[in-house]
Amino acid sequence: MAQNGSEGPLLAGVAGRYALALYELAHDQGQVDDVAKNLDAFDALYRESDDLRRLVRSPAYSAAEQTAAVGALLDRAGISGLAANFIKLTADNRRLFALPGMIRAYREKVRESKGIIRAEVRVAEKPSDAVIEDIKASLRDVAKSEIDLDLHIDPSLIGGIVVKMGSRMVDASLRTKLNSIRLAMREAR
């Protein structure tokens, strides 16, 4: 899988199908939010552990080895129920490599079902809680929908903000403004 989170059509298709099946099952059992919480807990473990990432990505481990290792991890982490069964199923089916994409696709399906729009926001330094709430309120007004804010700190922006919602992006960073000035000055010579 690509490091930047982009996926090829095969992986996106596998992830989407598995995520949709999980969502439909969770919805039928009234466990959509519980499954999301457990998947988020697993995703946090995945992001923090080099060993877990190796296990998930490596084709060197057999399905039985992956299932046993993941099962032990789920037990220790207190992840159970439908989410745990789903994660074990992906290991049994040799699809563990696609699990991060499945988790993203599941989150997107949950947001979609609740009418929530995801907004990626990049800023140069961590804003205060009040500023974060102001950003959310402004985006809520523009989108006319509830916002799920995904905040990233990117010091290379120098200042300002970059917002991406769906296919729209607004770059009001100081870095971009300085680059524009630099280009204008080159053309003026």
From Swiss-Prot:
Location in or out of the cell: Cell inner membrane
The molecular function terms in GO held by this entry are: proton-transporting ATP synthase activity, rotational mechanism
A Pfam family of this chain: OSCP
Q: Which InterPro entries match?
A: ATP_synth_OSCP/delta_N_sf, ATPase_OSCP/d_CS, ATPase_OSCP/dsu
What is the first-listed, main subcellular location in coarse terms?
A: membrane
Claim: Nucleotide-binding is one of the keywords in the record: no
Query: What keyword terms does UniProt attach to this protein?
Result: ATP synthesis, Cell inner membrane, Cell membrane, CF(1), Hydrogen ion transport, Ion transport, Membrane, Transport
Naming one, the record's GO cellular component terms include: proton-transporting ATP synthase complex
UniProt entry tagged with the keyword Ion transport = yes
Recorded hits in PROSITE patterns, A to Z, give:
ATPASE_DELTA
Q: How does it sit in the membrane?
A: Peripheral membrane protein
Q: How does it assemble?
A: F-type ATPases have 2 components, F(1) - the catalytic core - and F(0) - the membrane proton channel. F(1) has five subunits: alpha(3), beta(3), gamma(1), delta(1), epsilon(1). F(0) has three main subunits: a(1), b(2) and c(10-14). The alpha and beta chains form an alternating ring which encloses part of the gamma chain. F(1) is attached to F(0) by a central stalk formed by the gamma and epsilon chains, while a peripheral stalk is formed by the delta and b chains.
Which HAMAP family does the entry mention? Answer: ATP_synth_delta_bact (MF_01416)
- Family of this protein: Belongs to the ATPase delta chain family.
Q: What does this protein do?
A: F(1)F(0) ATP synthase produces ATP from ADP in the presence of a proton or sodium gradient. F-type ATPases consist of two structural domains, F(1) containing the extramembraneous catalytic core and F(0) containing the membrane proton channel, linked together by a central stalk and a peripheral stalk. During catalysis, ATP synthesis in the catalytic domain of F(1) is coupled via a rotary mechanism of the central stalk subunits to proton translocation. This protein is part of the stalk that links CF(0) to CF(1). It either transmits conformational changes from CF(0) to CF(1) or is implicated in proton conduction.
What is the official name of this protein in its record? Answer: ATP synthase subunit delta
**Which species is this UniProt entry from?**
Methylorubrum extorquens (strain PA1) (Methylobacterium extorquens)
Name the gene behind this protein.
atpH
